[in-house]
Amino acid sequence: EIKETFKYINTVVSCLVFVLGIIGNSTLLRIIYKNKCMRNGPNILIASLALGDLLHIIIDIPISVYKLLAEDWPFGVEMCKLVPFIQKASVGITVLSLCALSIDRYRAVASWSRIKGIGVPKWTAVEIVLIWVISVVLAVPEAIAFDMITMEYRGKDLRICLLHPTQKTSFMMFYKQAKDWWLFSFYFCLPLAITALFYTLMTCEMLRKKSGMQIALNDHLKQRREVAKTVFCLVLVFALCWLPLHLSRILKLTIYDQKDPNRCELLSFFLVMDYIGINMASLNSCINPIALYLVSKRFQNCFKSCLCCWCQSKDLLSLEERQSCLKFKANDHGYDNFRSSNKYSSS
Protein backbone atom coordinates (compact mmCIF):
# COMPACT_ATOMS: atom_id res chain seq x y z
CA GLU A 1 0.00 0.00 0.00
CA ILE A 2 2.83 2.39 0.85
CA LYS A 3 4.62 1.62 -2.40
CA GLU A 4 1.41 2.06 -4.41
CA THR A 5 0.68 5.43 -2.77
CA PHE A 6 4.16 6.87 -3.21
CA LYS A 7 4.40 5.55 -6.77
CA TYR A 8 2.12 8.34 -7.95
CA ILE A 9 3.46 10.95 -5.53
CA ASN A 10 7.03 10.30 -6.69
CA THR A 11 5.92 10.43 -10.32
CA VAL A 12 4.32 13.87 -9.86
CA VAL A 13 7.38 15.17 -7.99
CA SER A 14 9.74 13.77 -10.64
CA CYS A 15 7.77 15.41 -13.47
CA LEU A 16 7.81 18.72 -11.57
CA VAL A 17 11.57 18.44 -11.00
CA PHE A 18 12.08 17.56 -14.68
CA VAL A 19 10.25 20.66 -15.96
CA LEU A 20 11.59 23.14 -13.38
CA GLY A 21 15.09 21.65 -13.52
CA ILE A 22 15.45 21.92 -17.29
CA ILE A 23 14.07 25.48 -17.38
CA GLY A 24 16.00 26.70 -14.33
CA ASN A 25 19.39 25.08 -14.96
CA SER A 26 19.44 25.78 -18.72
CA THR A 27 18.51 29.42 -18.03
CA LEU A 28 21.27 29.64 -15.43
CA LEU A 29 23.83 28.24 -17.88
CA ARG A 30 22.67 30.66 -20.58
CA ILE A 31 22.97 33.64 -18.21
CA ILE A 32 26.57 32.81 -17.29
CA TYR A 33 27.52 31.98 -20.89
CA LYS A 34 25.97 35.09 -22.49
CA ASN A 35 26.88 37.76 -19.90
CA LYS A 36 30.61 38.47 -19.61
CA CYS A 37 30.18 40.23 -16.26
CA MET A 38 28.81 36.98 -14.79
CA ARG A 39 31.85 34.91 -15.80
CA ASN A 40 33.80 34.93 -12.56
CA GLY A 41 35.17 32.10 -10.43
CA PRO A 42 32.13 31.44 -8.22
CA ASN A 43 29.65 31.65 -11.10
CA ILE A 44 31.66 29.23 -13.24
CA LEU A 45 31.52 26.73 -10.35
CA ILE A 46 27.76 27.33 -10.08
CA ALA A 47 27.49 26.67 -13.84
CA SER A 48 29.37 23.39 -13.37
CA LEU A 49 26.94 22.45 -10.61
CA ALA A 50 23.96 23.30 -12.85
CA LEU A 51 25.38 21.21 -15.72
CA GLY A 52 25.72 18.19 -13.42
CA ASP A 53 22.10 18.61 -12.28
CA LEU A 54 20.95 18.94 -15.89
CA LEU A 55 22.61 15.66 -16.90
CA HIS A 56 20.91 13.88 -14.00
CA ILE A 57 17.52 15.41 -14.86
CA ILE A 58 17.64 14.58 -18.58
CA ILE A 59 18.94 10.99 -18.28
CA ASP A 60 17.97 9.64 -14.85
CA ILE A 61 14.56 11.11 -14.06
CA PRO A 62 12.61 9.80 -17.12
CA ILE A 63 14.01 6.29 -16.57
CA SER A 64 13.31 6.47 -12.82
CA VAL A 65 9.68 7.46 -13.50
CA TYR A 66 9.26 4.51 -15.85
CA LYS A 67 10.82 2.24 -13.23
CA LEU A 68 8.26 3.48 -10.67
CA LEU A 69 5.27 2.84 -12.92
CA ALA A 70 6.39 -0.42 -14.55
CA GLU A 71 7.24 -3.70 -12.84
CA ASP A 72 9.81 -4.85 -15.38
CA TRP A 73 13.16 -3.28 -16.39
CA PRO A 74 13.27 -3.17 -20.22
CA PHE A 75 16.39 -1.03 -20.75
CA GLY A 76 19.08 -3.69 -20.45
CA VAL A 77 22.11 -4.08 -18.23
CA GLU A 78 23.95 -1.07 -19.72
CA MET A 79 21.27 1.42 -18.62
CA CYS A 80 20.97 -0.43 -15.31
CA LYS A 81 24.58 0.50 -14.62
CA LEU A 82 24.49 3.95 -16.27
CA VAL A 83 21.58 5.41 -14.27
CA PRO A 84 23.07 4.99 -10.75
CA PHE A 85 26.49 5.99 -12.12
CA ILE A 86 25.18 9.33 -13.44
CA GLN A 87 23.16 9.91 -10.29
CA LYS A 88 26.21 9.47 -8.04
CA ALA A 89 28.43 11.50 -10.37
CA SER A 90 25.88 14.33 -10.31
CA VAL A 91 25.74 14.32 -6.51
CA GLY A 92 29.55 14.24 -6.38
CA ILE A 93 29.73 17.29 -8.67
CA THR A 94 27.27 19.10 -6.39
CA VAL A 95 29.16 18.20 -3.22
CA LEU A 96 32.63 19.09 -4.50
CA SER A 97 31.39 22.29 -6.18
CA LEU A 98 29.87 23.46 -2.88
CA CYS A 99 33.16 22.68 -1.12
CA ALA A 100 35.10 24.63 -3.78
CA LEU A 101 32.69 27.58 -3.50
CA SER A 102 33.08 27.71 0.29
CA ILE A 103 36.88 27.65 0.02
CA ASP A 104 36.75 30.26 -2.76
CA ARG A 105 34.75 32.66 -0.54
CA TYR A 106 37.34 32.38 2.24
CA ARG A 107 40.21 32.95 -0.19
CA ALA A 108 38.40 35.97 -1.65
CA VAL A 109 38.34 37.59 1.80
CA ALA A 110 41.77 36.43 3.01
CA SER A 111 43.71 37.28 -0.18
CA TRP A 112 42.16 40.05 -2.24
CA SER A 113 45.03 40.16 -4.73
CA ARG A 114 44.37 36.68 -6.10
CA ILE A 115 40.88 37.66 -7.32
CA LYS A 116 42.11 39.63 -10.33
CA GLY A 117 44.39 38.46 -13.11
CA ILE A 118 44.69 35.60 -15.54
CA GLY A 119 45.41 33.09 -12.78
CA VAL A 120 41.80 33.04 -11.61
CA PRO A 121 40.16 31.51 -14.73
CA LYS A 122 43.00 28.99 -15.03
CA TRP A 123 42.68 27.88 -11.40
CA THR A 124 38.89 27.71 -11.69
CA ALA A 125 39.22 25.55 -14.82
CA VAL A 126 41.59 23.21 -12.96
CA GLU A 127 39.12 23.03 -10.05
CA ILE A 128 36.23 22.13 -12.35
CA VAL A 129 38.24 19.44 -14.18
CA LEU A 130 39.28 17.92 -10.83
CA ILE A 131 35.68 18.05 -9.55
CA TRP A 132 34.34 16.19 -12.58
CA VAL A 133 37.17 13.63 -12.69
CA ILE A 134 36.91 12.81 -8.96
CA SER A 135 33.10 12.62 -9.16
CA VAL A 136 33.24 10.22 -12.10
CA VAL A 137 35.88 8.01 -10.44
CA LEU A 138 33.93 7.83 -7.17
CA ALA A 139 30.78 6.86 -9.09
CA VAL A 140 32.43 3.87 -10.81
CA PRO A 141 31.65 1.42 -7.93
CA GLU A 142 27.94 2.16 -8.45
CA ALA A 143 28.18 1.03 -12.08
CA ILE A 144 29.99 -2.13 -11.00
CA ALA A 145 27.68 -2.93 -8.07
CA PHE A 146 24.35 -2.55 -9.88
CA ASP A 147 23.19 -5.42 -12.07
CA MET A 148 20.06 -7.13 -13.33
CA ILE A 149 18.49 -10.18 -11.75
CA THR A 150 15.45 -12.24 -12.75
CA MET A 151 12.91 -13.15 -10.09
CA GLU A 152 9.45 -14.70 -10.08
CA TYR A 153 6.60 -12.42 -9.02
CA ARG A 154 2.90 -13.34 -9.27
CA GLY A 155 3.63 -16.10 -11.74
CA LYS A 156 5.80 -13.91 -14.00
CA ASP A 157 9.56 -13.68 -14.45
CA LEU A 158 10.55 -10.06 -13.89
CA ARG A 159 13.88 -8.45 -14.73
CA ILE A 160 14.92 -6.09 -11.94
CA CYS A 161 17.80 -3.60 -11.74
CA LEU A 162 19.23 -3.28 -8.24
CA LEU A 163 22.36 -3.32 -6.11
CA HIS A 164 23.29 -6.96 -6.59
CA PRO A 165 23.20 -8.97 -3.32
CA THR A 166 26.38 -10.87 -4.24
CA GLN A 167 29.45 -9.03 -5.50
CA LYS A 168 32.37 -10.58 -7.38
CA THR A 169 35.27 -9.05 -5.43
CA SER A 170 36.00 -8.48 -1.75
CA PHE A 171 36.28 -4.72 -2.35
CA MET A 172 32.80 -4.57 -3.87
CA MET A 173 31.39 -6.63 -0.99
CA PHE A 174 32.95 -4.12 1.41
CA TYR A 175 31.53 -1.25 -0.66
CA LYS A 176 28.05 -2.80 -0.54
CA GLN A 177 28.21 -3.18 3.25
CA ALA A 178 29.69 0.28 3.92
CA LYS A 179 27.83 2.13 1.16
CA ASP A 180 25.31 4.00 3.35
CA TRP A 181 27.99 5.18 5.79
CA TRP A 182 30.25 6.22 2.90
CA LEU A 183 27.46 8.20 1.22
CA PHE A 184 26.52 9.86 4.51
CA SER A 185 30.08 10.86 5.41
CA PHE A 186 31.39 12.00 2.00
CA TYR A 187 28.27 13.13 0.14
CA PHE A 188 26.58 14.85 3.09
CA CYS A 189 28.85 15.56 6.08
CA LEU A 190 31.88 16.68 4.03
CA PRO A 191 30.31 19.78 2.37
CA LEU A 192 28.68 20.83 5.65
CA ALA A 193 31.95 20.47 7.59
CA ILE A 194 33.99 22.35 4.97
CA THR A 195 31.40 25.13 4.77
CA ALA A 196 31.31 25.47 8.56
CA LEU A 197 35.13 25.55 8.76
CA PHE A 198 35.80 28.08 5.99
CA TYR A 199 32.87 30.33 6.82
CA THR A 200 34.13 30.48 10.42
CA LEU A 201 37.61 31.37 9.14
CA MET A 202 36.08 33.93 6.76
CA THR A 203 34.13 35.57 9.59
CA CYS A 204 37.27 35.78 11.74
CA GLU A 205 39.21 37.26 8.81
CA MET A 206 36.56 39.91 8.16
CA LEU A 207 36.43 40.86 11.85
CA ARG A 208 40.22 41.16 11.84
CA LYS A 209 40.20 43.75 9.03
CA LYS A 210 40.98 47.30 10.03
CA SER A 211 37.99 49.61 10.28
CA GLY A 212 39.55 52.06 7.79
CA MET A 213 39.89 49.36 5.19
CA GLN A 214 36.31 48.28 5.83
CA ILE A 215 35.08 51.81 5.15
CA ALA A 216 37.21 52.22 2.03
CA LEU A 217 36.04 48.89 0.65
CA ASN A 218 32.42 49.20 1.74
CA ASP A 219 30.90 48.59 -1.71
CA HIS A 220 33.43 45.91 -2.56
CA LEU A 221 32.73 44.06 0.69
CA LYS A 222 29.01 44.22 -0.01
CA GLN A 223 29.62 42.40 -3.30
CA ARG A 224 31.69 39.73 -1.54
CA ARG A 225 29.13 39.32 1.23
CA GLU A 226 26.32 38.84 -1.28
CA VAL A 227 28.26 36.06 -3.01
CA ALA A 228 29.10 34.50 0.37
CA LYS A 229 25.43 34.64 1.35
CA THR A 230 24.47 33.00 -1.95
CA VAL A 231 26.95 30.14 -1.48
CA PHE A 232 25.79 29.60 2.10
CA CYS A 233 22.19 29.45 0.87
CA LEU A 234 23.10 26.77 -1.71
CA VAL A 235 24.77 24.66 1.00
CA LEU A 236 21.77 25.09 3.31
CA VAL A 237 19.35 24.02 0.54
CA PHE A 238 21.55 20.98 -0.16
CA ALA A 239 21.52 19.99 3.53
CA LEU A 240 17.73 20.33 3.85
CA CYS A 241 17.09 18.35 0.66
CA TRP A 242 19.38 15.43 1.47
CA LEU A 243 18.95 15.15 5.26
CA PRO A 244 15.72 13.02 5.24
CA LEU A 245 17.16 10.37 2.91
CA HIS A 246 20.47 10.02 4.76
CA LEU A 247 18.65 10.06 8.11
CA SER A 248 16.34 7.20 7.08
CA ARG A 249 19.26 5.09 5.81
CA ILE A 250 21.41 5.65 8.92
CA LEU A 251 18.50 5.01 11.31
CA LYS A 252 17.76 1.76 9.49
CA LEU A 253 21.39 0.67 9.89
CA THR A 254 21.54 1.53 13.59
CA ILE A 255 18.03 0.78 14.90
CA TYR A 256 16.58 -2.02 12.79
CA ASP A 257 16.83 -5.51 14.29
CA GLN A 258 15.69 -8.59 12.35
CA LYS A 259 14.71 -10.32 15.61
CA ASP A 260 12.48 -7.46 16.77
CA PRO A 261 8.80 -8.59 16.81
CA ASN A 262 7.76 -5.06 15.74
CA ARG A 263 10.16 -4.97 12.80
CA CYS A 264 7.33 -4.83 10.21
CA GLU A 265 5.99 -1.55 11.63
CA LEU A 266 9.53 -0.19 11.81
CA LEU A 267 10.24 -1.19 8.21
CA SER A 268 7.03 0.54 7.09
CA PHE A 269 8.15 3.71 8.88
CA PHE A 270 11.59 3.56 7.24
CA LEU A 271 9.96 2.94 3.85
CA VAL A 272 7.85 6.10 4.21
CA MET A 273 10.95 8.07 5.29
CA ASP A 274 12.86 6.65 2.34
CA TYR A 275 10.24 7.74 -0.19
CA ILE A 276 10.02 11.22 1.36
CA GLY A 277 13.83 11.42 1.33
CA ILE A 278 14.01 10.40 -2.34
CA ASN A 279 11.53 13.15 -3.24
CA MET A 280 13.44 15.76 -1.22
CA ALA A 281 16.78 14.72 -2.73
CA SER A 282 15.26 14.89 -6.20
CA LEU A 283 14.15 18.48 -5.55
CA ASN A 284 17.78 19.50 -5.06
CA SER A 285 18.35 19.10 -8.81
CA CYS A 286 15.91 21.91 -9.64
CA ILE A 287 15.93 24.16 -6.58
CA ASN A 288 19.35 25.84 -6.92
CA PRO A 289 18.26 28.28 -9.69
CA ILE A 290 15.21 29.18 -7.57
CA ALA A 291 17.42 29.78 -4.52
CA LEU A 292 19.78 31.97 -6.58
CA TYR A 293 16.81 33.98 -7.86
CA LEU A 294 15.56 34.60 -4.31
CA VAL A 295 18.92 35.36 -2.67
CA SER A 296 21.03 37.17 -5.29
CA LYS A 297 19.85 40.49 -6.77
CA ARG A 298 22.22 40.14 -9.74
CA PHE A 299 20.95 36.66 -10.60
CA GLN A 300 17.38 37.86 -10.14
CA ASN A 301 17.88 40.64 -12.69
CA CYS A 302 19.56 38.25 -15.12
CA PHE A 303 16.81 35.63 -14.74
CA LYS A 304 14.12 38.21 -15.44
CA SER A 305 15.97 39.50 -18.49
CA CYS A 306 16.68 36.00 -19.82
CA LEU A 307 13.22 34.52 -19.27
CA CYS A 308 11.41 37.54 -20.72
CA CYS A 309 13.74 37.94 -23.72
CA TRP A 310 14.85 34.33 -24.35
CA CYS A 311 14.84 34.68 -28.13
CA GLN A 312 16.13 38.23 -28.28
CA SER A 313 19.67 39.46 -28.84
CA LYS A 314 22.23 39.23 -26.07
CA ASP A 315 22.67 43.01 -26.36
CA LEU A 316 19.25 43.56 -24.79
CA LEU A 317 20.56 43.47 -21.26
CA SER A 318 18.70 45.36 -18.54
CA LEU A 319 20.13 48.74 -17.52
CA GLU A 320 20.30 47.67 -13.90
CA GLU A 321 22.29 44.58 -14.82
CA ARG A 322 24.79 46.63 -16.86
CA GLN A 323 25.16 49.11 -13.99
CA SER A 324 25.77 46.23 -11.60
CA CYS A 325 28.55 44.88 -13.83
CA LEU A 326 30.18 48.30 -14.22
CA LYS A 327 29.92 48.95 -10.50
CA PHE A 328 31.56 45.61 -9.72
CA LYS A 329 34.46 46.37 -12.08
CA ALA A 330 34.82 49.89 -10.70
CA ASN A 331 35.01 48.51 -7.18
CA ASP A 332 37.77 46.12 -8.23
CA HIS A 333 39.71 49.00 -9.81
CA GLY A 334 39.15 51.23 -6.79
CA TYR A 335 40.37 48.56 -4.47
CA ASP A 336 43.54 48.02 -6.51
CA ASN A 337 44.38 51.75 -6.20
CA PHE A 338 43.67 51.69 -2.48
CA ARG A 339 45.66 48.50 -2.00
CA SER A 340 48.73 49.73 -3.90
CA SER A 341 48.85 52.94 -1.85
CA ASN A 342 48.62 51.01 1.42
CA LYS A 343 50.72 47.99 0.49
CA TYR A 344 53.55 48.75 2.92
CA SER A 345 51.63 50.83 5.46
CA SER A 346 50.84 48.03 7.93
CA SER A 347 53.48 46.85 10.37
UniProtKB/Swiss-Prot annotation:
Superkingdom of this protein's organism: Eukaryota
Lipid-binding residues (covalent, S-palmitoyl cysteine): 309, 311
Ranges that cross the membrane: 8-32, 44-69, 82-103, 125-149, 178-202, 231-256, 269-295
InterPro entries reported for this sequence: Endthln_rcpt, ETB_rcpt, GPCR_endothelin_rcpt, GPCR_Rhodpsn, GPCR_Rhodpsn_7TM
One GO term describing the cellular component: plasma membrane
Gene Ontology molecular function terms on file: endothelin receptor activity
Pfam families: 7tm_1
Keywords: Cell membrane, Disulfide bond, G-protein coupled receptor, Lipoprotein, Membrane, Palmitate, Receptor, Transducer, Transmembrane, Transmembrane helix
Topological region Extracellular: 1-7, 70-81, 150-177, 257-268
Compartments reported by the entry: Cell membrane
GO biological process terms on file: developmental pigmentation; enteric nervous system development; regulation of blood pressure; vasoconstriction
Disulfide bonds: 80-161
PANTHER family in UniProt: ENDOTHELIN RECEPTOR TYPE B (PTHR46099:SF3), G_PROTEIN_RECEP_F1_2 DOMAIN-CONTAINING PROTEIN (PTHR46099)
Function according to Swiss-Prot or TrEMBL: Non-specific receptor for endothelin 1, 2, and 3. Mediates its action by association with G proteins that activate a phosphatidylinositol-calcium second messenger system.
Entry protein name: Endothelin receptor type B
Protein source organism: Coturnix japonica
Recorded name of the encoding gene: EDNRB
